[in-house]
């Protein structure tokens, strides 16, 4: 028996895959699962979550391919299996295009490191938002500065 939310999740996942793989009219952004999706959708971008891709790949029996590819690339077996599989599935050509890469330092920072590695290989830009752990006024001020520097280099006067 399927619950209504399962159908909504499936429909959303299929629509997202269609946008990522067949519609290049909107920029695709690779993000970690903890990045605020409201920022991505609000800017008219289409998000891709490498960890989610690895989970879907596992459901399709593709994890061995992803893990073998990541091992061949030198990724340590000590890393998170989702991220190792994601690195391998990307290398094998199973992941969609990316127009930009962004991540947060919130909770899991391995995906941010994976994306930074991809950016290094591709020679493009990367934004890492350093999310404070405590929700107080000084943390909010810090995060506002981080957003300005990371997302608006012209406004901050800092070029990357």
Predicted segments with their positions:
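An N-terminal assembly and electron-transfer interface module characteristic of large anaerobic redox
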Residues: 1-160
């Amino acid at each position: 028996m399927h619950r209504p939310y399962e159908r909504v999740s499936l429909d959303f996942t299929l629509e997202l895959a269609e946008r990522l793989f067949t519609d290049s009219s909107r920029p695709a952004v690779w993000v970690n699962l903890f990045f605020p999706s409201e920022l991505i959708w609000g800017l008219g971008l289409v998000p891709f979550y490498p960890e989610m891709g690895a989970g879907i790949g596992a459901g399709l029996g593709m994890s061995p391919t992803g893990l073998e590819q990541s091992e061949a690339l030198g990724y340590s077996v000590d890393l998170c299996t989702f991220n190792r599989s994601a690195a391998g599935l990307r290398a094998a050509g199973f992941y969609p295009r990316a127009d930009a890469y962004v991540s947060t330092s919130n909770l899991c920072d391995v995906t941010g490191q994976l994306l930074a590695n991809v950016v290094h290989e591709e020679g493009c830009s990367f934004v890492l938002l350093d999310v404070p752990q405590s929700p107080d006024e000084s943390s909010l001020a810090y995060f506002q500065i981080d957003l300005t520097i990371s997302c608006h280099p012209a406004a901050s006067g800092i070029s990357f």
